[in-house]
Amino acid sequence: GILFKALLQNKNHQHIVVFEKDIEIIWIMFHILDFSSELQSARLMVLQTSSLDIELFSNFCSSKPFFQFSRIYFLELMSHYYERFHEDVLELNKKLVQDFKDSILSHGNDPLDALQGIEQFVYNLPQMITHPSYKELLSKRKGISDTAIIVSTGPSLTKQLPLLKKYASKATIFCADSSYPILAKHNIKPDYVLSLERIPLTSEFFNNDFGEFDKDILFVLKSYVHPHTTKYLQKNNRNFMLVSTYASFINYLKLDDFGYFNMGFSVANMNFLLAIHLKHKNIVLIGQDLAYAKDGLSHTKDYSNLDKHEGHFQRDKNKYTTQAYGDNGKVESSFVWTLFRHNFEQDVANAKKNYYITTYNCTEGGARIEGTIEKPFLWACENLLHKDLNKPFEKLEPLSLNKQNEFLLKAYYKVYQSIKHCRDFSNKFIKSYDKIKNSFMSLQNSQENETLIKEIIKDIDKIKTQIDELYNTQKDLMQILGPLLTQFELNLARIYVLNPKTKEDAFNK
């Protein structure tokens, strides 16, 4: 307690966060010293580790100011007493580090990636506006089925296909783009096929013609998908729609009928979240291994891109080991699957807490997904699927031609305006950049020039204020600038906390 009081005397310490397993120790401290004002202002925060759940970790690591200073995170032991709980401390540290990483990744780290998404979104706009809207989907199909089965392409999928075929009429079947050709091969018709990747390789899952099989399937595409995806679907007159996630450029266009829902990092996450919004009570996962099979396979044997994953098992071995399904030892995972799994675990916790949805992991293999109920697929079929659904589901209609033309014209105008915003922004800040760069070059040759240092800092602050104003007023720029500014601020925090002791230290800072 005395240590906390001393640390809190330093005005630079905005918050002190204490993780404590034995909360009685904290109560004793509160009886001895008065921390009422520090607790009320949240300068002192006490979290009992045994009561922390996935959602709390995620919210903590993505909130201000903790996220902004995530690159200088460290977990400090208060005394040697806590060394006896080293396993608990290491586990806590592991969770915090992972959640900070996930939060950073969720903000993006590449402006070029953001630009690719915007470019493909603009290219897809005519297809989105002239096809059925997300609003139409929700109005006609929400709540018509209790149980959703989400089909992914993990190594365990093959053994589940016979049961899936037998019970397909009794559940809503959502499948990943990569699972679609596999289900077609086994004549198992999904109700929804989802796709969200931006790359042309993923579009190739639709470069086929399954004829009558495709009738009544709805292909739901994230509005960022590669244009080849819609080209292949149009070629065979398949039913598709484009749906938007929450993003500043998309929101700027105000095409609200065609969104919005968060789609996560993978098509399996997207399937899961759409199943939530369509008001299913139970969600069953199959083929969701998120780990390599014992023989090193990354996907089911029918997966068309197996050759693209050769050598990955050897590359990842012993780097991303995690708990196995059914608590059967450990399995080998990958960086991307670990990210997907953590994203899934957050979604599962959210679905249970806020939507009262039960998630069953019936993969019977792969990695454990915390928060799911692990059951054999046969159990789920026999206990959750009792009657045939009224399939095919109600047909979706596009907007009227007049409404389509109205949205197309408004979107064109907004895109044109955004291009102008970007050009104005570029021209203005290139001049400011050149000025600061020239000043900085002069500074390197004159370390004693404190006046010049102050002038440079003043110019930088002025530009930062201007960027902040644009960031808050021109929402279309946010999506492009967001990843760059976030990474810049995270790195700047490392410099911000430095405490210069000499003039040279101040100069370097």
Question: What do the PLM-derived regions correspond to, one by one?
Answer:
Residues 297-347:
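Phosphate-binding loop/pocket of nucleotide- and phosphate-handling active sites
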Residues 146-150, 194-196, 250-261, 322-332:
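Short, basic, glycine/proline-bearing loop/turn elements
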Residues 220-221, 225-226:
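Phosphate/pyrophosphate-binding betaalpha-module
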Residues 227-290:
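Active-site/ligand-binding-proximal alpha/beta "capping" segment
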Residues 17-20, 175, 220, 242, ...:
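A structural signal for short, well-ordered beta-strand segments and their strand-loop junctions
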Residues 20, 179-180, 187-197, 275-301:
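Glycine-rich phosphate/pyrophosphate-binding loops
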Residues 173-179, 219, 268-271, 287:
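Extended, hydrophobic alpha-helical segments in both membrane/secreted and soluble proteins
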Residues 2-148, 155-172, 181-185, 192, ...:
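N-terminal donor/sugar-recognition subdomains of glycan-related enzymes
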